[in-house]
Amino acid sequence: MGNHIANSLNCIVIGAGIAGACTAASLARRGWQVTVVDAADPPASGASGLPVGLYAPYISADNNFTSQISAVGVQFTQKLARRLLLEGVDWQPSGVMTRKYGEPEQWHADAGWIKPAALVQACLSQANITWRGNCRVKRLVQNGEIWTLFDNDDQVLQQADMLVITASNQSADLLQDVPHAPKLNFQAVRGQVTYGNLKETKTSPQHPTHPINGGGSYIETDTQWLIGATYDRDNLSLEPSIRDQVDNFERLENLVPDIAEQLKPTFERGLVKNWVGIRCATTDRLPIVGEIMQGLWVCTAMASRGLTFAPLCAELLAGLLHHEALPLNARLVKALSIQRYMRK
């Protein structure tokens, strides 16, 4: 791999969500010329188009892999946000309070909210990165050390020495015809959030100064509030659902009853907005990061924790590629590795 890096620093990243944008930024900082391609016109058109989301640690009784990785992930996310985003507008290191029924509240100081599209745009605006939208990749072909991307008309879209697939649920489709590539069985999970204008909550005497998490999340930014999200494997429609809007109001009642009372007339009059995205999850709920074969890497399947996982996973990929000291211990690197699918 060292010789491969020495001979060329030209790379394509397929997918312009949080994972793809963070991966592109990590590689570009190390001198790579990165082209990011996506089937959509603007970046962050998939699940990363969420109006606002949380980065926060996941707490488990047994301190499982997800807990350990998320604890490191929030540090990388916060570092990246401080460098690229405008505090109070694009993100806020506000801390997050977790409330779960029958359990004491937990305060997470190293957590907060981020507008994912702002993070994606900021990453793609870095030096050494070129953005190409409306590029629907049909198949990948390796010829020697060169990877070629073809579109639906079998026309060449782009060529490079290295390719990183960060295309969420489409990653499995792109790999299916690549010889010796693993078969990835992702779970597509629909999520709907409900949101509106923040001024509708400002009269609340218990107006929260930080997001509330647990069985859903309630977030307030500089201009809006948001509650969600649903988790649905059976319905993958991108059309908003009234049923899910009702479910989100029930989440709000459980998390922040005072705010729910303030917003009840807004919900009843149908004056709220809804956003729907499709997450990409593995069966073990951990992302996939690593090298499939020379010049072909993957960094995807962030599920509902893209803001917590993606900056860390991007740095892990770059660290593996460049033989750097890694941000995770060997057990956690193995837990995320594509090799867990290569063996099957």
Regions found by a protein language model. Name each.
Residues W107-Q126, S168-Q170, D244-R251, C313:
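Mid-domain beta-loop-alpha active-site segment that forms a flexible
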Residues L9-V36:
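N-terminal Rossmann-like FAD-binding beta1-loop-alpha1 element of flavoenzymes
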Residues I12-I14, V37, Q158-Q170, A314:
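Short hydrophobic core segments
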Residues C22-R30, A39, A47-L54, I59, ...:
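Active-site substrate-recognition segment that forms the wall
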Residues A6-L9, N152-M162:
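Core beta-strand elements of the Rossmann-like FAD/NAD(P) dinucleotide-binding domain
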Residues V52-A111:
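Dinucleotide-binding Rossmann-like beta1-alpha1 core, especially the glycine-rich loop
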Residues D110-A111, L263-K344:
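C-terminal catalytic lobe of FAD-dependent flavoproteins
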Residues G133-T148:
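A conserved short coil-to-beta-strand element within the FAD-binding core of flavoproteins
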